Amino acid sequence: MLWALMCVALISIYLMKVGEMWGTNITRANEDELLRRGDAIRAAIDSYVRAESNGAFPRSFDDLLHDPRVSYPRRHLRAVYVDPITHGDWKLVTGPNGELYGVYSDAEGVPLKRDGFSDADVSFSLQTSYQEWKFVVYPSNGMVRR
């Protein structure tokens, strides 16, 4: 009888560890997806700004899906991605006149990832919250105006 109780206890401990590892793997996968989607949105904003000589920023995601400045279909973003951490809408980083500069997650968790970021995201290694991971294109980033 004692032997059976010890086996149940060991199996319970093992299953708890497996659950922790599984949760960590899911969190890491969601972080990777957050970086991928955020970088894609930032690249779309940059593409929109660079596509015309006036360097105007988009007003919304709709402008990225179909550029209203041209009469033919020009897409900078194929779809509006949801935030993979919250599974909801992104929070927007906007300019003084409502221009869309970028996005960030509204998730309150602490990121697991601390290094190995791309050059565009290297500042994320110092951030302590997903809300601080901002995928932004600012006009003052030395962007070349054509």
Describe the function of each predicted region:
Residues 1-18:
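N-terminal single-pass transmembrane signal-anchor helix
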Residues 9, 40, 63:
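Ca2+-coordinating acidic residues in Ca2+-binding motifs
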Residues 12-15, 38, 42:
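Hydrophobic faces of stable alpha-helices that mediate helix-helix packing
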Residues 13-29:
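Transmembrane signal-anchor/signal-peptide helices with a preference for the extracytoplasmic
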Residues 27-38, 54:
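Membrane-proximal amphipathic alpha-helices
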Residues 43-146:
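Low-complexity, acidic interaction segments enriched in glycine
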